[in-house]
Amino acid sequence: MKEPTTEIEIETSAVATILPPPLPPTASPHQALVERLKDYGQEDVFSLWDELSPEERDLLLRDIENLDLPRIDRIIRCSLHSQGLPVAAIEPVPENCVSTVEERTKEDREKWWKMGLKAIYEGKLGVVLLSGGQGTRLGSSDPKGCYNIGLPSGKSLFQIQAERILCVQRLASQAMSEASPTRPVTIQWYIMTSPFTHEPTQKFFKSHKYFGLEPDQVTFFQQGTLPCISKDGKFIMETPFSLSKAPDGNGGVYTALKSSRLLEDMASRGIKYVDCYGVDNVLVRVADPTFLGYFIDKSAASAAKVVRKAYPQEKVGVFVRRGKGGPLTVVEYTELDQSMASATNQQTGRLQYCWSNVCLHMFTLDFLNQVANGLEKDSVYHLAEKKIPSINGDIVGLKLEQFIFDCFPYAPSTALFEVLREEEFAPVKNANGSNYDTPESARLLVLRLHTRWVIAAGGFLTHSVPLYATGVEVSPLCSYAGENLEAICRGRTFHAPCEISL
């Protein structure tokens, strides 16, 4: 007998009622960033989002995601707010803070030279080169250090500076050979580039085999960039999918050294002192033993070489004391009215505000660590009004910058060391044909100085053009500051222009 069967009907509507409800749509990365940017009043960067291709949208998202928005917002707000605020009055630098050329004795110079060479021999000096700029004003898109100013040797600024390091290393090794076994001396060279100069600078050094230096004694690191802003603090868009950015000034070196962990690298190598300078001075005495010895002797936290202003209205920044008994710092020439710029010291006859900043500095490593931490917390940047590339063409906007001299207010002690302009300061900033700081003016300063060295060493010159327009070039591999030239020059005649080399 057939068993009865039971059919069970399942209503589909009943099944549907037990399914979980659909999830709400997830916010797109674009929408999430818009909400974040609203917190900082910068959501306009997405105003052209609907017109962008998928690839362009990805580029814009990456550009924004790479920003430290809280930090940048703090910098913008604090920097804009600081405009127009009263600042402490300035005073002239006290006389006892400056070692002048005329008061320096031969014994002082010899003592400091030996002290500096000893510290270099012991590996206590590192050198930082500020080399983020391009040679745009010189008519070149290459890093400025690649520039050849037209010396007889045809050497670039980078090569001249590298060879000065080689010379100092040799001098330190020779000076200490009597007291210690002769051994190679190595000065670590840290070169700060920018996003525009980093790769070409590295390629230039590699193609020239590091100019005789060991590759592992040269370290390249990049300074940071910050968005360019309008006068009301809004980001400027260079294209519909990218922000307009600019390097954060040569004072960005402090943050860059910290973020690259190079301050730790220096400490691990036993470096105690750091020489810091700009690339565009062809007469710079890199790793100057005398300056280093003076710095050590004074037990200062920071020091700077200074030159006297050529005339009261010269457009240079000068060292001052900020506030009654306050720290030494640098002010731009625009902060000095005509009466202050022309005021003289009744005792010395010098201008009261005469000590020009020429970006030749020395720091202890301990102080650099303090500065890197201090400037990271100090969100007030200099606002430089510039033409900024934008989607509407070049517009007037603001670049956010720190300057190398922003460190000095943090220093418990700063010592100033006067040098002669004609011996140590030949800037290369403007194209030939300009009124000052050209490759031609720098070339002549080098030739004239080196000609004096050769004549002092017993050499003679012949020349087909007036001597004021020519001269000789002494290779840094022969002499650092005019020393040890007698064996090469005495009784010999050189036809200018030429290079004297080993």
Swiss-Prot record:
Top enzyme category: transferase
Pfam families: UDPGP
Family matches, as CDD domains: UDPGlcNAc_PPase (cd04193)
Cellular localization per UniProt: Cytoplasm
Matching InterPro entries: Nucleotide-diphossugar_trans, UDP-sugar_pyrophosphorylase, UDPGP_fam
Protein family according to the UniProt entry: Belongs to the UDPGP type 1 family.
Protein name: UDP-N-acetylglucosamine diphosphorylase 2
Gene name tied to this protein: GLCNAC1PUT2
